[in-house]
Regions:
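Short terminal interaction segments
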Residues: 84-148
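Extended, charge-rich alpha-helical scaffolding segments
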Residues: 2-81, 85, 89-92, 96-99
Length: 148
């Protein structure tokens, strides 16, 4: 295989991997949107399932990143800066998506923090201390006779 064919193969593989990473990031963005809705609704079962999916997606993204890094090194060796334009465009899109993920993740963390505070306040209000005694409960003695 000549150098041109090798360069083209590296370019194709890198584009394919970057496209797969973009798809995973799109899935992650959609998942973050669904998580935000679940947090607002207070649906813990959905949120738990989404957290499991999130862990899986993040693992997939990191695996792809491990494959992409060596391909990028080969790409930079094969193509001097500015000779090929599709890969830098894909990388810019991925960077933008990464920023959007950070923003949505921060928003979801804040929503979750607010929801947890609401639940804490609700629990505190349910545990109001001291409680009023019931009419049906026996009266508690309040004086002690120590003369005997």
């Amino acid at each position: 295989m000549g150098t041109i064919e090798g360069n083209v193969a590296v370019l194709k593989k890198l584009r394919e991997m970057l496209s797969r990473q973009r798809e995973k990031l799109e899935d992650y963005l959609h998942l973050l949107e669904c998580q935000g809705d679940s947090i607002q609704e207070g649906d813990t079962q959905k949120l738990l399932a989404q957290v499991g999916l999130e862990k899986s997606l993040i693992a997939d993204i990191f695996t792809l990143k491990k494959v992409i890094d060596p391909l990028e090194s080969l790409y930079q060796a094969c193509y001097p800066a500015g000779t090929e334009s599709s890969v830098p465009q894909l990388q810019d899109v991925l960077e933008t998506m990464g920023t959007e993920i950070m923003v949505r993740n921060a928003r979801n963390r804040e929503r979750l923090r607010e929801r947890m505070e609401e639940i804490r306040n609700e629990i505190t209000s349910l545990r109001a201390w001291p409680r009023e005694s019931s009419r049906f409960s026996p009266a508690a003695p309040s004086l002690i006779d120590i003369t005997t």
